[in-house]
């Protein structure tokens, strides 16, 4: 039963893509998520714990409400890659999705996305939470990159998925990822933002240091950042020398700041991790390595079906840079195709859209785990039914 009487989506599965920065949630069969909010939980910090609940203080805040009150809260992102999963906070985010954002009772099943190479113990724990804490009648856990591929109507291809914390390259054949050929790099959108902070401070004499200022720099990146198609040439180009690429940005206090070559220098960390002292291949090389680690017979289909997913891949010219780099790395006989998005399609929503499509299929209930199966086999059933 849906608590919104005027809503006709109560027959649809609930679809949740809980990323490291944003959580997207909605109903299967719809074109876009109903709710998008920050994947963050805030609790009163030491200085404010003594404030009584009668004065309006809650034990915790989730999502955008936590961001608004961040000055008096200690914020945690439960999906951050470098930290152990905080299951209590995961439960709070899911509770917020069901009862505050979507306002539903859970009687039609849930599809939840997961990261590639998600550890078995994490998969079993979230399965336990869904059945024992939220009492869902059906549950399905799906690789976020596979869902992104589904959003393009494909079962075969390779997904370069770059969100806030990690970039993955995931080859997929007949709707299943190929685990031994998946690569990952702990450089993504957050790394680009932090590098932009660093070079603006060093090159322009600014002093961006706080978390609030980091959000400002993130906004600068999203408004003015782009990927260079020829980094060394652009770095010493006439446009840079004559300040033609400079843009002005107004800070919240009204001060105007200027950004020039930093607009494309920041994104180069994705292709040259050594800029931030990380010894690793760039995202283009990881993509190529994932392809050549697959059987020869399926490589052509991977080269010809490259999907870019995650907000970081929305930086202008990212698509063309990836294509150019792969052309340089690959045999000349191979056709390289990066699948274009439809007008107004948001790369950061692809996993959710794929989940919406998959959960609306007539076979979804049969493919998902039922409450009866969970009661009979326990949480390990996830390893057999969702792979």
UniProtKB/Swiss-Prot annotation:
Source organism superkingdom: Eukaryota
SMART domains membership: ACTIN (SM00268)
Coiled coil: none
Transmembrane segments: none
One BP term from GO: phagocytosis
Signal sequence region: none
Enzyme class: hydrolase
Record has Nucleotide-binding as a keyword: yes
GO MF annotations in UniProt: ATP binding; hydrolase activity; myosin binding; structural constituent of cytoskeleton
Location(s), subcellular: Cytoplasm, Cytoskeleton
Catalytic reaction annotation: ATP + H2O = ADP + phosphate + H(+)
Entry keywords, A to Z: ATP-binding, Cytoplasm, Cytoskeleton, Hydrolase, Nucleotide-binding
GO annotation, cellular component aspect: actin cytoskeleton; cytoplasm
SUPFAM superfamilies on file: Actin-like ATPase domain
Classification via InterPro entries: Actin (IPR004000), ATPase_NBD (IPR043129)
EC code: 3.6.4.-
The keyword ATP-binding appears for this protein: yes
Homology family: Belongs to the actin family.
Function: Actins are highly conserved proteins that are involved in various types of cell motility and are ubiquitously expressed in all eukaryotic cells. Multiple isoforms are involved in various cellular functions such as cytoskeleton structure, cell mobility, chromosome movement and muscle contraction.
PANTHER family reported in the protein's UniProt record: ACTIN (PTHR11937)
Name assigned to this protein: Putative actin-29
Taxonomy of the source species: Eukaryota, Amoebozoa, Evosea, Eumycetozoa, Dictyostelia
